């Protein structure tokens, strides 16, 4: 057989690995550790697509490489299995979401195993397993005990069709829900919040210690959004009311000519005049129908309504009209802003639209034409005139503090985490509300609080979750006869994924979240690979919970993930007609290298696009494995380009990777293997070992594979292959194409053992040195020959070799040699006449 028979070889080795528990996590405490973590998937009904294995293959290469280097390797997989899609499916079909989820997990697991990943399945976790979410609930009770989990009446993004509130991040720019595209309205509801803001400074500062890309760190820094400035208190004219504004530029107070409150601000109704009441009420209603993203869009037309009230500017006593406008959010800052239209473009546009005064307080621009947003010396600012920004801020803050109408303040863009969902398919929040007005956490001895099985998982209609319909579960009575009601909100999908990497370390522990000694052994995670779409929320939430657990003494490290890597996206192919309209792939045929619409015959333009069901361009890994084999898929996805690049899927590239593996198979099975080294491949082999080792370490898998190809080309030029080089090469390719490597290993090693723990090959630095070098031979300054000669020959030896060359002899035949100039390792120049 002169080709790699993947249909026979791959299932054979997958069966071997499963039977022998080949990838069981090592426990030898004398060995170094390596913890390689994938972002665990949500097991959807669609199964894996070819984008999933890209990151999984990367961590698998590292895991196999580290095992061969003698590390204990923890390389686990599990399921982020709570969430809306399963619940939506259950409501649509009447089936139990647990059954749907179990079927999907079985399918995902089958697909993952078919790709030959070296997971330790003894450590599999599932966020919907009560033995797992017992500890999710335990973490919540600890947060509650420390005052970091609390209830609040907050405006939420309510989606009537989904029957739940959703997070800001789940609202699309057009004001509809990410899931389903339903209308989103703002309405106040009782919600559970987690006080992530208490950790804002630590979440910000500790980023500096992490081996993450600067772009991801910057996204987190921007999300946390630290601002230093001042709180300024404004009194409302003719009342005893006042409100506070946070500003990063208190030095521009003399230019503040009006103030703007969020429509939801608590003062609005109290200060609105009777003449303006109807307009204000109407505006508040309109604002409630818009998402925060829509409201704060810089490009949208400015809208607002005057309340009829005035604020008093604390530095000059001037009256400032108080407006409401939807671009101010109640959830951000204090829900109120002081408007300085001369030096803020949004305020300037608002002032122009509603004919409000514009007062310049920083020199350098023409504020009649546009807001001047650069720095300049202060003008029209009384005791700040002539000062620069830093000096003016210091002086105005001192003035405000002395007068009792302001103080220095640090704020964060980060808001507390809205932690409740009005859905069934999530972890029950372990809290009981008693009729005497108190609330208590469910005792640890009664955890897990198990999600009751029910077919009635429609939204309750009251804004509560479907759990409110289950009175047997809902209603409880204390020993003293006091009646209570369980919390009906469930946790968001983020909960189970905020700590799963800890449970992998000790997944069967019934006494605690995980054993302290094991946590010390394995933390932090050495490398975490996943999509950049989780750059902010999941990573921020996991870091928050980890820091909280660190404060409790549960985990030994301040940070969970030492190194983070975001793989790129594998794009599909799209086709467009002359109008630019997309054509689904089932309506496209290929002829003579071009693409045509099967119905109209029109030639189409091909371009990369995100894989989607609607375009029918999703590639299923099952089909690839069936036709080409898992090792081909693995090698192709790693060879496509840099791991962090987004690259289009190519059938031709897949075929190229398959041909390479066939060449590898033929090289080892057809070439004569020698016990003695003839030295012919010394340099090529040692270069390959060094390059592949270094490139795996730096996650440059595409260049590592390119180097393996270089070696195959070099080896194919030789008649025979040295046994140690054959073995070493098989070890080098094993992390990329493990099934092929296992099969070939059996042909060169007599042990019958798996290649998985055979020591990684080393290289001989002395064999990397060039022992030959190319020199040029010039005659009268023109290059006439290029010769390969031994390195470091003397001038005399070089001259002798050059003059003996047949080509050179022909050139100088019949001519007199005047002089020969030899430069070792470079050239020989012959002067003739």
From Swiss-Prot:
One Pfam match, by short name? tRNA-synt_1_2
Catalytic activity field: tRNA(Leu) + L-leucine + ATP = L-leucyl-tRNA(Leu) + AMP + diphosphate
Top-level taxon of the source organism: Bacteria
Disulphide bonds annotated for this chain are none
Places the protein is found: Cytoplasm
Q: Which GO terms describe its biological process?
A: leucyl-tRNA aminoacylation
Question: Can you list the GO cellular component terms from the UniProt entry?
Answer: cytosol
Q: Where does this chain carry the motif 'HIGH' region?
A: 41-52
Q: What is its main location?
A: cytoplasm
Q: Does the keyword Aminoacyl-tRNA synthetase apply?
A: yes
Q: What is its EC number?
A: 6.1.1.4
- List the molecular function annotations (GO) for this entry: aminoacyl-tRNA deacylase activity; ATP binding; leucine-tRNA ligase activity
Q: Keywords of this protein's UniProt record, alphabetized?
A: Aminoacyl-tRNA synthetase, ATP-binding, Cytoplasm, Ligase, Nucleotide-binding, Protein biosynthesis
**What residue intervals hold the motif 'KMSKS' region?**
610-614
Binding site residues for ATP: 613
Q: What InterPro entries does this protein map onto?
A: aa-tRNA-synth_I_CS, aa-tRNA-synth_Ia, Leu-tRNA-ligase, Leu_tRNA-synth_edit, M/V/L/I-tRNA-synth_anticd-bd, Methionyl/Leucyl_tRNA_Synth, Rossmann-like_a/b/a_fold, tRNAsynth_Ia_anticodon-bd
Q: Does the keyword RNA-binding apply?
A: no
- Which PANTHER family has this protein been placed in? LEUCINE--TRNA LIGASE, MITOCHONDRIAL, LEUCYL-TRNA SYNTHETASE
Q: Which HAMAP family match?
A: Leu_tRNA_synth_B
Give the protein family: Belongs to the class-I aminoacyl-tRNA synthetase family.
Write down what this protein is called. Answer: Leucine--tRNA ligase
Q: Which gene encodes it?
A: leuS
